Amino acid sequence: MRILCIGDSNTWGATPGEDSLRLERRWTKVLQELRPNDEIIEEGLSGRTITAKDTIVPVRCGVDTLPLLMLSHVPVDLVIIMLGTNDLKKQFNPSAKHLARGIEEFIKYIRNPHLVENYKTPKILVVSPVHLRDEILERQNSFGEYDENSLRQSRFLAQ
């Protein structure tokens, strides 16, 4: 089975304060160990969003880059989508409903029968965005990326 894992810094393997351990601790490595007969394709990009447009680094928008990711890795049996945390940043004026629509857009694109006409449509697993806790307001960097609305929308998604 070929499993394409599309995600953000969590898929990329970000570990606070321990960048040297990034490659060995990311969840895709654990998945590969649990499924040694499968091919795990890691597509993690720090800062990647579902639909939010990052004006500084535009290639971080998932819906814009999804076609390239899908076409470059066919055939794929399963796509795991683990995105959404970055869409909750205050600069994007986050809304849980908008985030849910973005995930639906991802799913529709992956299920598009014209995407890869000679291959079957892959199964899809959506992993909920990482739940933001109150501590993020105190621990974030000087950019102040998350605010109270970010926390509210994260809680709404968790329900």
Label the model's feature ranges:
Residues M1-S46, T51-I56, L69-L71, V79, ...:
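Serine-esterase "nucleophile elbow" of acetyl-processing enzymes
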Residues R60-Q159:
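Alpha-helical cap/lid subdomain in secreted, periplasmic
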